[in-house]
From Swiss-Prot:
HAMAP family: NusB (MF_00073). Transmembrane segments: none annotated. Involved in transcription antitermination. Required for transcription of ribosomal RNA (rRNA) genes. Binds specifically to the boxA antiterminator sequence of the ribosomal RNA (rrn) operons. InterPro entries: NusB-like_sf, NusB_fam, NusB_RsmB_TIM44. It comes from the Bacteria. The gene is nusB. One of its GO terms (biological process) is transcription antitermination. Belongs to the NusB family. Keywords: RNA-binding, Transcription, Transcription antitermination, Transcription regulation. NCBIfam families: nusB (TIGR01951). GO terms for molecular function: RNA binding. This is Transcription antitermination protein NusB. GO terms for cellular component: cytosol.
Amino acid sequence: MADIKGKYSPRLANKRGAARLAAVQALYQMDIVGSGVMETAAEYEAYHLEKNIDGNQYLDADFQWFLAIITGVVKDQKQLDPMLHQQLSAEWSLSRLDSILRAILRAGLWELINRQDVPIAVVMNEYVDIAKAFFEGDEPKLVNAVLDSMAKKIRL
């Protein structure tokens, strides 16, 4: 599992925020290990969500929200990736991005498209906070810029 460099923002200490973080980690795991959605979901439900592992207490997460994100991203990835590719420069092409950053962008874009009931600001803030937990450089700014641009196109 990818290392989290920063501390959790207070916004991540809610069930949906915890589900988003877990979904990003699961998408990263699926990308790196090549595991399937149901296998990964079962592993997270059994071993990660709401568990104390090696002294680390995992946050109480909304499992249905987590499952919706990971299944949705995998199902819609062929539509999501070209949309993300259009937003990125040659220096930040999708294939060159860190796997965890790709997972963050895919999950955030999927949620913007498919969860119209969630305010844009909530989606953007949550995924920028997740990016800040993993990265100390320009990556959170990239997440903010890409999701902001996509939100303007998707939710006019």
